[in-house]
């Protein structure tokens, strides 16, 4: 059976692994998922990630980050734009999360970037998810 929303599946796997304090989580890989993981690492929400080749689509292994080995750095990770209802914003309408404490991840013409990078570059795009 094909997956309707692979990005939502990735975010759900990260959310579930974070709640049960797993050190790592394996996700079927894709270019977009690797780009999202890169932004999460850059913003300090995950320790690291790596792509493992399995001669099929590959596996994206995400290493989760915890505060004092008990509380997850990610409090909430939420899919915004879905296959049934895409959410696009103009450059001057890019939202903030928790008054700037969180991050909005957008898909723009320049790739997958954060809300602050989109504002600096004057770019709008599709809101993939919010993290805080």
UniProtKB/Swiss-Prot annotation:
The keyword Chaperone does not apply. One of its GO terms (molecular function) is rRNA binding. Pfam families: Ribosomal_S8. InterPro entries: Ribosomal_uS8 (IPR000630), Ribosomal_uS8_CS (IPR047863), Ribosomal_uS8_sf (IPR035987). The keyword Ribonucleoprotein applies. GO terms for cellular component: ribonucleoprotein complex; ribosome. Signal peptide: none annotated. Keywords: Ribonucleoprotein, Ribosomal protein, RNA-binding, rRNA-binding. Coiled coil: none annotated. Gene3D superfamilies: 3.30.1370.30, 3.30.1490.10. One of its GO terms (biological process) is translation. SUPFAM superfamilies: Ribosomal protein S8. Part of the 30S ribosomal subunit. Contacts proteins S5 and S12. HAMAP family: Ribosomal_uS8_B. Belongs to the universal ribosomal protein uS8 family. NCBIfam families: PRK00136.1. One of the primary rRNA binding proteins, it binds directly to 16S rRNA central domain where it helps coordinate assembly of the platform of the 30S subunit. PANTHER family: 40S RIBOSOMAL PROTEIN S15A. This is Small ribosomal subunit protein uS8.
